[in-house]
Every structure is written in structure tokens, then in C-alpha cells.
Swiss-Prot record:
Database matches in Pfam families: ATP_bind_3 (PF01171)
GO MF, one annotated term: ATP binding
Entry binding sites for ATP: 30-35
The name this protein goes by in its record: Probable tRNA(Ile)-lysidine synthase
Domain notes: The N-terminal region contains the highly conserved SGGXDS motif, predicted to be a P-loop motif involved in ATP binding.
PANTHER family, per the entry: TRNA(ILE)-LYSIDINE SYNTHASE-RELATED
Reactions it catalyzes: cytidine(34) in tRNA(Ile2) + L-lysine + ATP = lysidine(34) in tRNA(Ile2) + AMP + diphosphate + H(+)
Length: 456
């Protein structure tokens, strides 16, 4: 009988241990055999090897099926029996008719990760483990093969052992949380055999066997009947992940040698490349380089790799372009041997200006333009302010608030259109109160704060 030994599992945690150190770990527990075995392994690793020294299991009640709460409470009982600390969480669907949603699987996934993210923030947890395994990886590969566009490959990396927690970029603090998958090297039959060997109790979700419910269920049934394909799919994911690591390392080297400046208050990136050096790099490397640079400036939730692929050569050929709401301006310098590239936020359209003007309350972070988390504190807690882009009419007011030297420095740091893509706080009569990304506060009773969503 093929099982997973405790030492084997612990060895797969070694690289994770280096990342996590002595911080508390979280575990996402559905109650199924995968997450219950993961919880058991964590407890046994703590007893036998002294790590993790602290962990907590988060039991998520999805509230989609009538008996889901009963199953969640049974899972908590099973965890308590193993002396595993746990917290009950549930998804609040509000007035939504869950079963009328055509994309229920996707929405449920989003809600689940958001609930887990908030729990991690509440419990000061930076790393949470899920029980994804090799069969899940194979299913993901087949899902992406069915959906991907010809000529793209990024999605074929599938699930990585370590990644940022997904579906939670609208939650302040989510970017600090990593998702760990220590069971990814192991197959479902190994997990089942190991759980049975150690007498671990779990709950079965009957909907997982309904091939008419979701595409993933149908793919799971197909792969169960063709075990060899599961192995080949996981090998494919491993190969693409190795390719991604090699490209990432090259991009790291290029950025280290070629970044001129990254102005965080405006999210503007300036680089300078040797044209001869650029020619030596593959298209894949240049595409990943551009994608990495764009993520530091974009206001898009996701950047389509296809848009980067189609325009990559034009960018490095010195053309002015817009990609993913970023303006890319390049020029040749030093006898045409070098290429200088600046990436900044694309100027707002009239429609965007309206959307980017919002009323906010004190002491609560608000994500603005998907780039900056803005918050302000005020002695009068009833005070509401307007969060909006800087406008040309604000410059005269700004001259009155800043010294001549400060105003000149500000204009140099954010020249031209760039200055009109940064956020300001104002009263309802448009009187400036502050510029949070620069740390400017123009009212003594108000202090603004900014967290930058993207960091170099």
C-alpha cells in the first residue's frame, strides 16, 4: 500500500520552514480527507520535529448545501479530538440565491479565499497551508489546456508550492499572506491510504462526484479513468515551473542592473537598457520583464499575458504605447546604444476621473485606482473627505501649502501628466486636505496614510 511517511511530509516542509521561520501557520480545512490528513501531519510534525511550533486550522462552512454547517461542526469535533486548535468561519451570502448562480464554483472559491484572508489578518498569520495535491494539479492543467488561448503558456505552471493568496487583492494586508501547498507532490491514492492507515476521520462532499455540476468534476472523473494522464500532467506543470524559475532569475538580474529609479508615490518606473544586451535575451524573458515592470504601475487587477506578448517587441523597439492602463515611453540615448524606458500610469479618461472620485470615512483603508491603500484619521470621527485625482486647478492651492522649494521638487518628481494620476484628499468644496502618497497633510486635525499595493 502506497502511503506518505511523516518524515517524507516533513522533508517537503523544509523549504517552507526557511520562509516561515517560527511564525504561526494557518491551515485551510474543508473537512475532506486531504485537509484532515494535512492537519494530522502538522500536529505530528510539531510533536516529532518541533515544527511548526504554532498553527491553527480554519474550518470554512461554505453554506451551499443544507447540511454544510453540520459537516463543519463535525470537522471541528474531529480536529478537537486530535488536539488541533481551530476556528469556525462561514461564508455570508447575504440575500443571494446561491443555487441560481451560473458560476457558483468560481464565486464560492473567491468567497472562501477572502474569508481565509480576513481570518489570517485577524490572527496575525502570514502563511496558510492548503491540501492541494498532485491530482488537483493535473485537473488544473487540463482546465487550463481547455481554456487557454493558442500561443500562451503562463497558466500551464498551474499551482506552485508557494504563491500569494488569490482572490483577495481587494483586502488590505492580503499581499503579505502566502499560500503554501506541502501536499502538492503526493497523489490522492497516497493520501487516502495514509488517512486510513492512521484512522483519520473525514467528511465526504457528495457534490464532488457530480460530473454535471462543474467542469472540474467531469475532468476529475476522466482522469480517474486514465491515471497515466494525471502523472504526465503533473510532469508538464513541473517542467513549466522550472522554465518560469529560470526566466524569473534572468529578469531579477536584468532589473538589478537596469533600474534607474522607482518613484513609489506615483508608481513610476524608469529603466535604462543596453540595446546589445537586450538582443541577447529570448522573447520569453523580455515578455516576463515587461510583465513584471507593468505590475508595479498598472491599475488593472490582472494583466493579460497575450497583450504583453503582442506588443513586447514594439516597446523595446522604442515606440510609445499603452498597455494595461500604463503609458510606456522609450527613447534612445548615448549614441543610440541605450534604450531609456519610462512606465507610468496612463492619464485618466473623463469616465475614469468620475469613478476615481469617491467619498471616504476616517480610519478605514480604501483601495484607490488599484494602486494605493489610502486612510486618514481625524479628531472629528464624523468628518468625511473626497478621495480623487490631483487636478490642474489644485496646483495654485498647492503653491500656497508648500514652500517654493517643496513645490519645485514636487513638480520635478511628478512631471507632466504623471502628477494628475496621484490621489489627493479634499473637502467637499474641493479644498485640498492632503496628498497621502507624498505624506503631505494640510489640515492639523487630519493625518493621512498610504500603503503602496505594489513594491519593487
Amino acid at each position: 500500500m502506497d502511503t506518505i511517511k511523516l518524515k517524507e511530509f516533513y522533508n517537503s516542509l523544509v523549504s517552507i520552514r526557511r520562509r516561515v521561520g517560527h511564525r504561526r501557520l494557518g491551515i485551510a480545512v474543508s473537512g475532506g480527507v486531504d485537509s484532515m490528513l494535512l492537519s494530522w501531519f502538522m500536529k505530528e510534525s510539531q510533536i516529532m520535529f518541533g515544527w511548526p511550533n504554532q498553527f491553527i486550522a480554519f474550518v470554512v462552512d461554505h453554506r451551499i448545501r443544507k447540511n454544510s454547517t453540520e459537516e463543519a461542526l463535525q470537522t471541528i469535533w474531529n480536529l478537537n479530538r486530535m488536539l488541533i486548535p481551530n476556528v469556525y468561519l462561514n461564508i455570508n451570502w447575504g440575500n443571494d440565491d446561491v443555487h441560481s448562480l451560473t458560476n457558483l464554483e468560481t464565486i464560492a472559491r473567491e468567497h472562501r479565499y477572502q474569508v481565509l484572508t480576513r481570518a489570517c489578518i485577524t490572527h496575525n498569520i502570514r502563511h496558510i497551508c492548503t491540501a492541494h495535491h498532485a491530482n488537483d494539479q493535473a485537473e488544473t492543467i487540463f482546465m487550463r489546456l481547455l481554456r487557454r488561448k493558442p500561443g500562451t503558456w503562463g497558466g500551464l505552471c498551474a499551482m506552485k508550492p508557494v504563491s500569494q493568496i488569490p482572490e483577495s487583492d481587494s483586502i488590505c494586508g492580503a499581499s503579505n499572506i502566502e499560500l503554501l501547498r506541502p501536499l502538492l507532490p503526493y497523489y490522492k491514492n497516497q493520501i487516502l491510504n495514509t488517512a486510513k492507515q492512521h484512522g483519520i476521520a473525514w467528511e465526504e462532499d457528495p457534490t464532488n462526484a457530480d460530473i454535471n455540476l462543474t467542469p472540474r468534476n467531469a475532468i476529475r472523473r476522466f482522469l480517474n479513468q486514465h491515471a497515466a494522464l494525471t502523472v504526465e500532467a503533473t510532469k508538464l506543470a513541473t517542467a513549466f515551473q522550472s522554465l518560469q524559475v529560470n526566466i524569473d532569475n534572468k529578469v531579477d538580474e536584468i532589473l538589478k542592473d537596469n533600474i534607474v529609479s522607482y518613484h513609489q508615490p506615483s508608481g513610476t518606473l524608469s529603466l535604462c537598457f543596453s540595446k546589445n544586451e537586450l538582443k541577447k535575451h529570448s522573447n520569453l524573458t523580455k515578455e516576463e520583464l515587461l510583465l513584471r515592470c507593468l505590475t508595479l504601475t498598472t491599475s488593472c487587477r490582472q494583466i493579460k499575458r497575450s497583450s504583453v506578448v503582442s506588443l513586447c517587441n514594439s516597446v523595446f523597439d522604442g515606440k510609445k504605447l499603452t498597455i494595461a492602463k500604463c503609458l510606456l515611453t522609450s527613447s534612445s540615448i548615448k549614441d543610440d546604444t541605450k534604450l531609456q524606458l519610462q512606465i507610468s500610469r496612463q492619464p485618466f479618461s473623463k469616465a475614469e476621473l468620475k469613478k476615481k472620485t469617491i467619498t471616504i470615512n476616517p480610519d478605514r483603508y480604501v483601495l484607490w485606482d488599484h494602486r494605493f491603500w489610502i486612510k486618514y484619521s481625524c479628531k472629528n470621527t464624523q468628518t468625511t473627505l473626497i478621495l480623487r485625482p490631483l487636478l490642474s486647478k489644485d496646483l495654485n492651492s498647492l503653491k500656497g501649502f508648500l514652500s517654493k522649494e517643496e513645490f519645485l521638487k514636487f513638480c520635478i518628481q511628478v512631471p507632466g501628466h504623471i502628477r494628475f494620476t496621484i490621489p489627493v484628499l479634499s473637502e467637499e468644496n474641493d479644498k485640498l486636505v492632503g496628498i497621502p502618497t507624498f505624506g503631505f497633510n494640510f489640515r492639523s486635525d487630519i493625518i493621512s496614510n498610504c500603503l503602496h499595493k505594489f513594491k519593487l
